[in-house]
Amino acid sequence: PYTTLFRSMGNELHIAHGGKGANQAVAAARLGAEVTMVGCIGEDAYGQMILDNLKENFINTDYIVTVPNTTTGTAHITLAEGDNSIIVIAGANAKVDQSVVDNAWSAIEQADLVMVQNEIPIPTIEYIVRRCHKENVKVLLNPAPATDLDSEWLKLATYITPNEHELSALYPNQSTEETLLA
């Protein structure tokens, strides 16, 4: 039968702005950079919260697409006894495709640096990295969350910022030292 099982009741719920891309955009803008955000949000309160936060931080949101009948990507983090667990719902992030990038290309090609991370589809990340490389636009790849990426196009990124766990996922047959020396 249907029973609610729990070890303990929760105490608090906090809702905060976020997403790796949005956090990086806000941080760069607060440091004085001129920032344009490219991506997708859902047709919901979370999407509106993200859009409002970006605008409040003077980020150009002209290339953020609101996807009808779709939820905004979210991450739900539970913390119990010092241990966290994260449930990620891709939502509209899964809709960031080549057409979204192409629509924003006039802004992208003018950028001093394009920042991308693994919370959008891998084929889209590959497209961005390859096109930026071809057109001499610097690209920084934050390979989080950790996943296996094709080293053929991965090496085309100008900068890669993995943590130790992500580094071992990208280069599973090499030690950290071997990878850094390569």
Predicted regions and their residues:
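Beta-strand->loop->alpha-helix junctions that form or flank phosphate-binding loops
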Residues: 11-14, 38-43, 61-72, 142-144, ...
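Conserved phosphate-binding/catalytic loop of the ribokinase/pfkB sugar-kinase fold
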Residues: 40, 66-67, 77-113, 118
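Glycine-rich phosphate/adenosyl-contacting loop at the front of the ribokinase-like
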Residues: 1-40, 45-59
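Structural alpha-helical scaffold elements that stabilize or flank donor/cofactor-binding regions
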Residues: 4, 106-107, 153
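Short beta->alpha connector loops
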Residues: 44, 119-123, 143-147
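Conserved phosphate/ATP/ADP-binding segment of small-molecule kinases
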Residues: 129-182
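Short gly/ser/thr-rich secondary-structure transition/capping motifs
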Residues: 58, 94-99, 139-145
